[in-house]
Amino acid sequence: MYTSHEDIGYDLEDDRKAKNKKTLKPHPDIDGGWAWMMVLSSFFVHILIMGSQMALGVLNVEWLEEFHQSRGLTAWVSSLSMGITLIVGPFIGLFINTCGCRQTAIIGGLVNSLGWVLSAYAANVQSLFITFGVAAGLGSGMAYLPAVVMVGRYFQKRRALAQGLSTTGTGFGTFLMTVLLKYLCAEYGWRNAMFIQGALSLNLCVCGALMRPLSPEKLENCPEAEEPCALPAYSTESVKSGGPLGMAEEQDRRPGNEEMVCDLQTQECQGQTHPRKNVCAFRVLKTVSQLTVQVRRGFRDWHSGYFGTASLFTNRMFVAFIFWALFAYSSFVIPFIHLPEIVSLYNLSEQNDTFPLTSIIAILHIFGKVILGAVADLPCISVWNVFLIANFTLVLSIFLLPLMHTYASLAVICALIGFSSGYFSLMPVVTEDLVGTEHLANAYGIIICANGISALLGPPFAGWIFDITQKYDFSFYICGLLYMVGILFLLIQPCIQMIDQSRRKCIEGAHV
């Protein structure tokens, strides 16, 4: 397992907080109880967001017929939606720090639904860029990141399996949404299909409502300190998880903020002899002051995570992981966007209608996430090794796909793509091992942002290459080569770890 979260520079206050954290009792909902509701909530979020996006190849064909634009331009609609969902990750981290996961996810569900509904009235591809690409993509990002982060907070053991089970929603969603969108487009047209999908997306608000923050526990034998029971934000062992307003004054002890809250508390107590309307006014002011404290604290935590003394970018292994994410995701997204048209070019539409190739990817994707997650949790198996093997299998499949021209051979390659891409369930686990639980929200936001850039540029690039060559072969070859570059960055990480271990041994030998 990684120990590289030690590479991040913490100050002395963080070290003291880490010592205090050891005295905490295990939270009853960690690894059990409501934790499994987090898995269920995240599962449905993946169905509604990632599943719908992986089924956009159906709508891509409809948009080509409706607007008569080039494949490269039309592919930007799907790419914008997928890309923005992931690119906004670091900024959604600010919302999570300030408002909590529950509120962020609920707002995201509303914005995503609005984007789908407005897209039903689009007059051209450029309109879809705004309504579907930007609006629906932003809403998806606001609901997606909290779903991943909350599972990470609620699980300490079996994290890989929990993330694997929750992210299988992508596979189920791809299968279900592909069938659903095909049926809706055939029966009602693509515009009404998007309107109906917008209504379904409101269920993201229900999923967000289930993201209950970890409740504070009464602690015994808490060491005396200037800051009683001070705990780091965003730890699964922290008493603060979703950022309730009532905890704001306890967790921000800066002199100015403390004075503001204390003064208002004193005024409220003195106001008991005042008319009721004065008491209500003091309570409103107190709530506003607590909200101000919370926003300041959330922004400070978010800013320090990226640019402060605890910057994630001081972790060399994490930086190498970011470079991998920049190249990898497009190789997974491109088949979903362009496979329906590839099948049409090969005159395999009849067989594909019986059992779509994207559904094969989706089904094997489900098994891949669960199996790879379970294997990675075995004590004798390294998560890193499982992650690397799956990556090599996926890039090999991408290289082989253009060579297949029959339905059976394409089905085999799609099965390999689906199963090996199950490593996505390991990404939060690997990220958490690299930076620690406290920095998971910010760190995973950066990783999915890098994935988003890859998803944003990949499909339009493949469509542009097709417009020039009238073949998708070169698109897959080039994306496969870029993926190999990303894997080379992954291989840098073990080398860095070996160098660090040798340095430690040399230092220890010198002291002896």
Swiss-Prot record:
KW Calcium (keyword) present: no
Transmembrane segments: 30-50, 76-96, 105-125, 129-149, 161-181, 193-211, 317-337, 355-375, 381-401, 410-430, 446-466, 476-496
Gene Ontology terms for molecular function: symporter activity
Membrane topology: Multi-pass membrane protein
Domain of life: Eukaryota
Cytoplasmic face of the membrane: 1-29, 497-512
Places the protein is found: Cell membrane
UniProtKB keywords: Cell membrane, Membrane, Symport, Transmembrane, Transmembrane helix, Transport
Pfam short name (any one): MFS_1
CC annotations in GO: plasma membrane
Keyword Membrane: yes
Xref: PANTHER family: MONOCARBOXYLATE TRANSPORTER, MONOCARBOXYLATE TRANSPORTER 14
Family to which this protein belongs: Belongs to the major facilitator superfamily. Monocarboxylate porter (TC 2.A.1.13) family.
Described purpose of this protein according to its UniProt entry: Proton-linked monocarboxylate transporter. May catalyze the transport of monocarboxylates across the plasma membrane.
Protein name (database record): Monocarboxylate transporter 14
Native source species: Mus musculus
